[in-house]
Amino acid sequence: MIASESTKSWEASAVRQENEEEKKKPVKDSGKHPVYRGVRKRNWGKWVSEIREPRKKSRIWLGTFPSPEMAARAHDVAALSIKGASAILNFPDLAGSFPRPSSLSPRDIQVAALKAAHMETSQSFSSSSSLTFSSSQSSSSLESLVSSSATGSEELGEIVELPSLGSSYDGLTQLGNEFIFSDSADLWPYPPQWSEGDYQMIPASLSQDWDLQGLYNY
C-alpha cells in the first residue's frame, strides 16, 4: 500500500516536471501575423503575402512588403478575386475600393495585389475610392511626367528655334551652322531705277546718302 502511494507520488512529480520543461521550451515562431490573414514575417523583418490557388496545392506569391498592412491589402485583393463574396478580408471596409484584376490569371492577380499594397487608406471611406497612391509613388509619377514634358518641349524648340538676327548683317553672314542673307542696297552693282512716285516716298534721311534726283534721271 505504501509502495503504491509512493509510486503514484513519483509519477505525479515526473508529470509536473515534464510540463514545466515543456513550458520552458521556446515556441517556434511561424512568422504569421497575429491579426492579419495571409501575412507572414520574414527573419529580416519584411512582410510577405501569398494565397493558395483554388482547387490546387500551389500558391500565388503576392510580394514582399515593408509593413504588414501592405501585405494584408495585397492578400485581400487576391482573396476577393479568387473567393469572391465568401472571402474573409483583413479590411472589409475597403472591399469596394480595392483594384480588380483584369483576369483570374496569377499574373493579373499579382498586379492588382501590388496596386492595393502600395496604396494608403484615407480616413473616410466612400463608394468612389478611399485609396490614394502613396506620396513616393505620386512624386515618382509626377517627376516622370514632368521629365517627358520637358523632353518634348526641348525637341519642339529644336524644330522651331530661329537664329537671332541681331542688328544688321551685310551680304551673306554665317551664324553658327546657319547662313543669313541680308539684301543690302550697298552691294547692288547698279543703282535701282526710281520712279517719280518712289522718289517722293523716300525719307529725307536717305536723300543725304544718295543722289536720288540723279538716280531718277538715270
Swiss-Prot record:
SMART domains: AP2 (SM00380)
CDD domains, alphabetized: AP2
Organism of origin: Arabidopsis thaliana (Mouse-ear cress)
Comp. bias (Basic and acidic residues): 17-32
Segments of the chain annotated as binding DNA: 35-92
Protein name per the record: Ethylene-responsive transcription factor TINY
Lineage: Eukaryota, Viridiplantae, Streptophyta, Embryophyta, Tracheophyta
Location, primary (coarse class): nucleus
Taxonomy, superkingdom: Eukaryota
Keyword set, alphabetical order: Activator, DNA-binding, Nucleus, Transcription, Transcription regulation
